A protein has these predicted regions:
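Acidic, surface-exposed loops and disordered segments
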Residues: 1-117
Length: 117
């Protein structure tokens, strides 16, 4: 309860770099998040280059902290891995529906929440 009651939103960020080692550890720890059917319907786009951050800014609602951050993480609902898995087994993926979108969005949100905690 202490963690929940002390939650806050931060809008001012440090420009201190995040090491590859720390980032890798956090991403790996978040992989333990339960997902729908253990399909892990998410991906994380890691962006450090200025040009990449500029191009991704609209997806982050052009928030100024995106271009100023040393690293930007974009958490995405993603069927790519599961689609390839199905196709390699001569199966039709069948994710073109709202329920699949909700499952993937939920997986991405849960992964992101675990990463941030």
């Amino acid at each position: 309860m202490k963690t929940i009651n002390s939650r806050r939103t931060i809008r001012k960020y440090s420009r201190k770099d995040v090491s590859e080692g720390l980032l890798k550890t956090l991403l790996e720890q978040a992989e333990h998040t339960p997902t729908m059917g253990n399909l892990q319907l998410y991906s994380v786009v890691i962006t450090r280059k200025e040009e990449g951050k500029r191009r991704l800014a609209p997806a982050h609602f052009n928030q100024p902290m995106v271009e100023g951050a040393p690293v930007v993480l974009t958490f995405c609902a993603d069927f790519r891995r599961t689609t390839l898995w199905a196709e390699n087994r001569n199966a039709t993926p069948g994710y073109d529906n709202f329920l699949s979108f909700l499952n993937a969005a939920t997986d991405a949100l849960l992964y992101c929440q675990t990463f941030c905690n």
